[in-house]
Amino acid sequence: MSIARRTTLSKFLIEQQRETNNLPADLRLLIEVVARACKAISYNVSKGALGEALGTAGSENVQGEVQKKLDILSNEILLDANEWGGNLAAMASEEMETFFPIPANYPRGEYLLVFDPLDGSSNIDVNVSIGTIFSVLRCPDGKQATEESFLQPGTEQVAAGYAVYGPQTVFVLTTGNGVNCFTLDREVGSWVLTQSNMQIPADTREYAINASNARHWYEPVQRYVDELNAGKDGPRGDNFNMRWIASMVADVHRILNRGGIFMYPADKRTPDRPGKLRLMYEANPMSFIVEQAGGAATTGTQRIMEVQPTGLHQRVPVFLGSKNEVERVTGYHAEGEGK
């Protein structure tokens, strides 16, 4: 690709703003700030042990999970980058118990930013792809945010995206008008458009699930996976492959590129907790992206983006990816009225 003919993220967003007239300037600027923060996170991730940021921080987040040093650093990078620009009323992070209002000494805007600063951080020390997930909502209360301001269904998202820090660093974005992927050119420091209007195939022969939990699954999931594992001799009449990276951004990025279904169901170990993934920080933004790419995303019983949040750290079961497979496993839940 000729350097002169490259489309950078900034150019792409400005053209979107001109052509569609549904991308406000403040939202465009907010997305660019998030993308710059992801570049800074990518730089720190890539330094590895040389950056003295590997290992645990000796603390736990609100989820009760041990925090990695890079979890905390990534969270701080996103907060510091976005607090002063005048585009936001508040932010909420998977790593923080309560939301973060924009300090009084900075101007406030009309948007809310929700993020998982470093998804898949258990993989940091073993050099497996990890990433950042984010979602943007409008603040319904003008510029004075409360926790309730964030509790909007995913259908209210105005933008969502993720960055993957892997062999390449990529930034995947939707503003409700398709899904596009930008690759970080480290030589010039720009995000360059490398994939336009990404589409997930409706059919697939790949699935992603943590099979070590099989003994805990509810019957609809057990039935679905058993059929896949039966291969050509089973009811599906075809062979399926399992892929599991244990990093949602990496698994979803693969599915976005070549199809597949990602599953993180509820299970019998914690019947009072419906799933592990967080609705606001992971499930909603990924569902927005997947649906914009022609896929589907459900909890097994309803469309993820129609779930009404009841708390910042609410968890949900997740089934997303190739439309026909998501519809099949969702249908099994309906037949069994199970989880």
Curated annotation (Swiss-Prot):
User: Which residues does the record give as substrate binding sites?
Assistant: 119-122, 210, 276
Copy out the cofactor comment: Binds 2 magnesium ions per subunit.
**What cofactors are annotated for this protein?**
Mg(2+)
Residues that hold Mg(2+) 1 according to the record: 94, 116, 118
- Give the record's subunit note: Homotetramer.
Q: Name one GO molecular function term.
A: fructose 1,6-bisphosphate 1-phosphatase activity
* Key words of the record: Carbohydrate metabolism, Cytoplasm, Hydrolase, Magnesium, Metal-binding
The pathway entry for this protein reads as: Carbohydrate biosynthesis; gluconeogenesis
CDD domains the UniProt entry points to: FBPase
Per the annotation, which location comes first and is thus the protein's main one?
cytoplasm
Pfam families membership:
FBPase (PF00316), FBPase_C (PF18913)
Give the top-rank taxon of the lineage listed in the UniProt record for this protein. Answer: Bacteria
Q: Name one GO cellular component term.
A: cytosol
Question: Reaction catalysed by this chain?
Answer: beta-D-fructose 1,6-bisphosphate + H2O = beta-D-fructose 6-phosphate + phosphate
Q: Look up keyword Chloroplast and say if it applies.
A: no
Please give the PANTHER family that the UniProt record associates with this protein: FRUCTOSE-1,6-BISPHOSPHATASE-RELATED, SEDOHEPTULOSE-1,7-BISPHOSPHATASE, CHLOROPLASTIC
Q: Which family does it belong to?
A: Belongs to the FBPase class 1 family.
The name this protein goes by in its record = Fructose-1,6-bisphosphatase class 1
